[in-house]
Every structure is written in structure tokens, then in C-alpha cells.
Amino acid sequence: MDVYFFVMEITSFLKLLSQTDGFGFGIFVIGCSSQFFNLVFLCCLLLLGLKFLSFKGTSLFLQYLEKINRISPNIEFFNSFNREHKDCNNNNNNNNNNNGFISKSHLADGLDQKKPIILHWSSDSTNRLSWENCDLLLLRDGLDHIQNRENTVALSETELDEKNHHGEEEESEDEEESQSQNDEDQLLDVITLRTMVKRERKRGDYMKKELEKERRAAESAAEEAMAMLLKLRMEKSVVEMETKQYKRVAEQKQVYDQEVIQSLQWMLMKLDDDEDKIQM
């Protein structure tokens, strides 16, 4: 309602502002300054309204939290009920419609020891039946629950120890199997390595034989090549000697021919002289 009145007042005030042409004095009334101030004032009003709403919302939220805190002590969680609670349960079932308890179906479901149940206690309950006995029974239930929890923890620890022991045995068996597999793998690796070494040795011997054959063939080819070179050198030397001889013979023949030509020329000249003398 407060918010409604506040909004109504704001709307009426906005109507008044829209009806006025401007406010101020002197130079502030000139031009569009009145509209600018109206806008600024509207922004301020909006901020104030938001602050008021946020404060109102937080106060409502705090009131809601206080109500929850008032109701929460009246809610209790139970883990199990035994057959010794028949009196307390009968009283609770008789006062189910008056004291605001849960229905019989929910209570029957809650009697299972493995399921927790929630009892909503009303603030205006007038019939208080054997609260002390119920508290004692609830304390006993809590102690039994703690003992059961300790027993379950001990059993879980023993189970964990057994599981760890079985796990260690399985790990040891796995390690033995892995060791045996590793030994077998090592044996297989050794056998394969031996076969590979033998194969490589055979291949090496074969390659050595082939290299020896190639070396011998290369040596024989080199010897043949050397013999051919020697033969060619000898032939070359013979040819050179023959060419020298032919050249010398040709030179001697040329000299002889020149001498013969000169002698013939001298004889012709002599014959010409003799003929001239005879004609005279």
C-alpha cells in the first residue's frame, strides 16, 4: 500500500510538472532550461524510488528469514524408530489431527529404520503427552544410531582391509604374471636376437665372399689394364722409332736428290758451253 501511495503521489507530481511551463529565475527560464531541470528532477525521483523499493525488499526478505528461523527449531530429523516407541507413536497418532503432525501413511513410511522422517510441530499444540519419555527414546535412538554407524564404519574398515589385501594379492599375482610374461618376452627376444645375429653373420660371410670375388676380378682387370698400357707404350715407342727412322731416311734421300739435281745442272751447263765452242 505504501508503494501504491508513493507511485500515485509521483504521478500527480509529474502531472503538475507537465502543466507548468518552467521554473527558476533570471537566465534559467530562458530557452529549454526548464525542460532540462525537469528531466534532472525526474531522474532524482527515480533514484529515490529505487532506493525505497530496495530497502523495502530487503526488509521483507529479513522478515521472511526471521519467520524461517522461528519455524526451523520446530523441525526435527529422525533416523530410526524401534518397537519400544509404541507409546510415543500411539500418542502421536491420537493427536495427529490436533497437533499438526504428519499423516499416518507418512509415519508408516518413516518407521523404516533406513528412512529419516520429519515431524512438523505446530506452535499452538496444547496436549503435551510424555515428552520426557519421547526425549529419552529419541536419545536412545541417537545412541543406537551412533553405535550402528560405528559398527558400519568398523565393518567398512574391515571390508576395506580385506579389499586391500585381495587387491595386494591380485597385484602380486599380476606382478608375477607380468614378470613371467616379461621373462617369456625376454626369452623370445633372446631367441629372436640369436636368429637375427646368425642371419646377419651368414649375410656378412656371403657379402665377404662376394667382395673377395669382386676384389679378385678388379685385380685381374687392373692387371690386364696394366698389361694393355705397357703394350701400348711399347707400340708407341716402336712407332716413334720407326717415324724417326723414316724421317731420317727421307732427309737423307732429299739431300741425295738435291746433290743429283745439282750435278745434272752442272753437266748441262758444261754441255752447253761445249756446244757453243764447237759452233764458233
From Swiss-Prot:
Signal peptide: none annotated. Keywords: Membrane, Transmembrane, Transmembrane helix. The keyword Transmembrane helix applies. It is a single-pass membrane protein. It comes from the Eukaryota. Its main location: membrane. One of its GO terms (cellular component) is membrane. The keyword Transmembrane applies. This is Protein FLOURY 1-like. The lineage of its organism: Eukaryota, Viridiplantae, Streptophyta, Embryophyta, Tracheophyta. The chain crosses the membrane at residues 22-42. It is found in: Membrane.
